[in-house]
Amino acid sequence: MIQHDNGVFHLKTQNYSYLFRVSAHGTLEHLHFGLPLRTEDADAFLCRSGLGWGSCVVLDDDDPGSCLDDKALEWSGCARGDYRESPLELGGLPSDLRYVSYRILEGTAPMESGLPQARDGGETLEIILEQPGAQLKLYYTAFPTTLTRRAVLVNTGDGILPLTKCMSFSLDLPGSYTMVTFNGGWIAETHREDTPVGPAKVVNESLTGASSNRHNPGFLLARTGANEDSGVVYGFNLVYSGNHYASAQRSLQGLTRVMQGVNMSNFRRELAPGEAFETPEAVMAWSDGGFNGLSLAMHRFVNDHIIPAYWRGRPRPVLYNSWEGCMFDFNQHRLVDLADRAVDLGCELFVLDDGWFGQRNHDKAGLGDYNVNKKKLPQGMEGLADKIRAKGLQFGLWFEPESVNPDSDLYRAHPDWALTDSFPHVLGRHQLLLDLRKPEVRDYLVENVGSLLDKAKISYVKWDMNRHSIALGAAAHDFVLGLYDVLERIFAPRPQVLLESCSSGGNRFDLGMLCYSPQVWCSDDTDPIERLDIQGGLSYLYPQSTFGAHVSADPHAQTLRHTPLATRANVSYFGCLGYELDLKHLLPVEIRQVKAQTAFYKQYREVFQYGTFRRTETGWQVSHGGITLAGVFHRLVHAAPGYEQLRVQGLNREDLYSVTSLEQALRVGQFGGLLKHVVPVNVDPNGALLRIADRRFSLKNGVQTMTLSGSALESGIMLLPLFRGTGYREDQRTLGDFGSDIFIIENCNPGSF
């Protein structure tokens, strides 16, 4: 609901109120973003300047309260007395946009530039600000748990209007905050980092041409004292996949200015008369339930309003991907054999990754060509796809459409299609980007990718992009608009094709891609211990239904770390489960484990993918329909470990719950030569007997079963003891380094949830 009363605008849902007002001077003053309020409460949140501060520049010399520098504002200009960072820069010209009018629109106001946006909004508020030669439209759309903001600048004059900066929003919040960002790099994405916001500006930005693995566009502002389950937290994100910028800075008056939008480094757009520039949509959320409360608001928004309609709430298949198992070394016979093994293990989708086209026997050639390599696939893609589907599997295929190798037929025919500049080429992973600003390039991709999807009846696409861009400023923005055009033209007519976006892993995990791609490959790092940080970081802003999460071989290619097969699955369950290893090397004991893993995941798939996600003291939990699944994850063990508790949140305290830990295999070989202390024969730790036993047999590992009240589980129950170096028993948890548990908690009171 959006209300306007005596100059006060009020966006209100069951979860929040957002209020601002038009001042006597036509500026927009922010009042409140938080708990639902009455419109009549608005005056209580007004920043009253009194006689003002010294050194103020005022809009009206007769009004000492007309200084903008000490106000909480919704938008600000340049050279009018507000010396904080401005969201708008007009190439060195002053900006003084004042309120003119408003409209309340039903639903979402469509964007006109080709940018994606959130769908199915309730109402939209349009605010018009003007100055001579320029008009600014501010759009606010109310969603149940979030609101979105964006801006459109229009040249209403007779000459050129230079634009060098235009943010999606600017907002001043009272109070002190910590800015929480999610940073990293290739195979080390989205690690949480907390930075106090003070007088020095804190910036979160990307300049790689993509939203980047270095700095995810989503970030939080946490009020002092906030934790996972209590305290005030604001969340912000951008529906955009290119260079982004966000900043936060606290003023002398205790106001924290936050803004976000396209990164305008090296940006200049000269708007002709009547021409407009439209910013991406920014997303804002508030919670007084700590970080988990904020995550819940963002998760619901993404699942309900960002993900393509066809895939909202739809279960994602358990997939097998050929990359880590085969890389470029495969042929049709090997792929069909892997498909036989995959379907036997319980997989539902077979994905052929890189290496199927042109002379693609390594990563130095072939990108840009779409002719199937008949030496590897003599029956073509249709023939392979038919064989895969005949086994009861769906068939998926990897593409990297945005890139081209200089050693490719496409580049030899159209070198001008590559994104280059006046200097010698600089390559990334031996490749250039195609210039998606050019219509002929976009047409080529739409025709070739779309044709192959239709001919081979492909059910799933992994869309990769493996290098950073050289495009600067406005050119980088136009490249992203070209990408969105290609994605829209390929996938809008084929909504049933499941698109998984990838960019060297998590280099483009953002809301813009999620408007087309229901899930994203989180990282090229499949080590589950690294994934605890990567997926854990993503979970603050993105739901687990968007996480591509695979079980891979041990030791892990990215870390050389050895981890239990159970832990690899236990981490991957909290996302869209897949397997990515050479299946022919699985031991008999591992085959049994994987079959049990896929069966367990399918049984609880809806809970894992769409349940309410919470970060806990010991790991993660998801809850849906009276079922909670709690993961307990260990890193390095210590000698003589103490007692461990499991606390479960979000239960009905009076109800009874059955609690069962997931049975997990304990490899015999984990004990090595220690077995000689418990078996009647002297076991050679390097001998054939132990190797055979380790391949075929496993031990029980501390299954715990009980029935308890919700209050008990919320208080924290004692788990079975961990291994303490005093021997093995079936009723202890022998986990070792990087071990983990899954607990299944089910409500025993039908109809109470």
Sequence positions of predicted segments:
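Polysaccharide-binding surfaces and accessory modules of carbohydrate-active proteins
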Residues: 7-10, 14, 18, 28-249, ...
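Conserved, mostly hydrophobic/aromatic
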Residues: 15, 151, 274, 320, ...
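Carbohydrate-binding surface patches
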Residues: 15, 220, 228, 617-654
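Glycine-rich, aromatic-flanked loop segments that form ligand/cofactor-binding clefts
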Residues: 65-111, 225-247, 284-310, 347-354, ...
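Short Pro-Gly-centered flexible turn/kink motifs
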Residues: 94-102, 269-288, 737-746
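Aromatic-lined carbohydrate-binding/catalytic grooves of carbohydrate-active enzymes
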Residues: 311-450, 458-460
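Active-site neighborhood of glycoside hydrolase catalytic domains
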Residues: 373-380, 412-566, 570-591
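C-terminal beta-sandwich/jelly-roll accessory domains of carbohydrate-active enzymes
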Residues: 637-753
